[in-house]
A protein has these predicted regions:
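C-terminal His-loop and adjacent cap/lid subdomain of alpha/beta-hydrolase
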Residues: 1-6, 26-167
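Gly/Ala-rich beta-loop-alpha elbow adjacent to hydrolase catalytic centers
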Residues: 10-17
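Short glycine-enriched nucleophile-adjacent loop
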Residues: 17-29
Length: 167
């Protein structure tokens, strides 16, 4: 027999990430129960489920917009959960609370994440409608052209060397 069990890693993109997160609502304890070593979730659609799952995994996860944000020195213990979410991805940022609450990605001081329009401000109802319309164009991609924007993560998927370092 084998001396060591193989490592089990989860990978999910968009709705695939959402489904996996729904299956393990308790975060680490569910990962342990299922024998999962680590997870990489890409472009998880927003909403209350996403907010609560980020909260459950906050002490053991890192959220990045692109691979260049991966720290040279990883924290100890190494994060088990990685979220790759573009700052300007409306699919990730859209949620019902936009109707009535200013999102963290649109702070009053005017700072913006990459690809969040500089002139965008939060207005009750308006920002919700704008983000809703933006979701319709978030996957408007050109074949063969990998861009690091919207809900197109092809240019930002980590290569094997990076994945081995992270997970």
């Amino acid at each position: 027999g084998r001396a060591h069990r193989p490592r089990v890693l989860l990978y999910g993109e968009s709705l695939g990430a959402r489904v996996q997160q729904a299956a393990i609502p308790e975060g680490s304890s569910d990962l342990d129960r299922l024998g999962v070593s680590a997870a990489l979730w890409v472009g998880t659609p927003g909403g209350p489920e996403s907010v609560s799952f980020h909260a459950v995994t906050a002490g053991e996860s890192i959220t990045i917009d692109r691979p260049e944000q991966i720290p040279d020195v990883l924290p100890d213990p190494r994060p088990r959960v990685w979220f790759l979410e573009h700052d300007g991805d409306p699919v990730v940022r859209f949620r019902p609370l936009l109707l009535t609450h200013r999102p963290a990605w649109l702070p009053t001081d005017g700072t913006r994440g990459r690809n969040v329009p500089a002139g965008m401000t939060w207005k009750p109802g308006i920002t919700y409608a704008q983000a809703f319309v933006d979701t319709m164009f978030a996957t408007n991609v050109k074949p063969g052209l990998f861009e690091s924007r919207g809900h197109d993560y092809r240019a930002d998927l980590p290569d094997d060397e990076i994945l081995r370092r992270l997970l």
